[in-house]
């Protein structure tokens, strides 16, 4: 085993490079202009564009909209599954009953029943529409749409 001790540790030969000392005379090869060339914006101190600057073209972060939008009627309509009607205790169901049971949100005005799940009991829907498949399932269970 080699003679490695904490006080003799050093990096491998050639693995570390000395820091570039620019502007310290012509003998260094990086004197005078210090690797910046002659004149121009990039040769000046502080001479760099801001982040996102695209040369005067409208930058990406200003071309894109700040945020999307919410359709005004989005929360007025709700879909109700047959399986949700099955769990409700009331026989006559309207939008108010759906709100009271927590099936739809409080801002909902119109509801539509879709054929998803099973319905095995009689329900009467008032002021609620239904898809053709849901209507058939409700009527097959002895219910109706009023």
UniProtKB/Swiss-Prot annotation:
GO MF entry, a single one: rRNA binding
GO cellular component terms listed in the entry, alphabetical order: cytosolic large ribosomal subunit
Entry keyword annotation includes Coiled coil: no
GO annotation, biological process: translation
Disordered: region residues: 1-56
SUPFAM superfamilies per the UniProt record, alphabetical: Ribosomal proteins L15p and L18e
Keyword vocabulary terms for this entry: Ribonucleoprotein, Ribosomal protein, RNA-binding, rRNA-binding
Residue spans of biased composition, Gly residues class: 24-34
Superkingdom field: Bacteria
Role played: Binds to the 23S rRNA.
Subunit structure: Part of the 50S ribosomal subunit.
PANTHER family (UniProt xref): 50S RIBOSOMAL PROTEIN L15, LARGE RIBOSOMAL SUBUNIT PROTEIN UL15M
Family per record: Belongs to the universal ribosomal protein uL15 family.
Protein name: Large ribosomal subunit protein uL15
Organism: Bordetella pertussis (strain Tohama I / ATCC BAA-589 / NCTC 13251)
């Amino acid at each position: 085993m080699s003679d490695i001790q904490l006080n003799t540790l050093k990096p491998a030969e050639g693995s570390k490079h000395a820091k570039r000392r620019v502007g310290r005379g012509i003998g260094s090869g990086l004197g005078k202009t210090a690797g910046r060339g002659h004149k121009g914006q990039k040769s000046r101190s502080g001479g760099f564009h801001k982040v996102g600057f695209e040369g005067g073209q409208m930058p990406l972060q200003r071309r894109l909209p700040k945020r999307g939008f919410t359709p005004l009627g989005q929360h007025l309509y709700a879909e109700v599954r047959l399986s949700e009607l099955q769990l409700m205790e009331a026989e006559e169901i309207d939008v108010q009953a759906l709100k009271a049971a927590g099936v739809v949100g409080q801002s909902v005005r119109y509801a539509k029943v879709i054929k998803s799940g099973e319905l095995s009991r009689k329900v009467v829907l008032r002021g609620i529409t239904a898809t053709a498949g849901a209507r058939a399932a409700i009527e097959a269970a002895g219910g109706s749409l009023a």
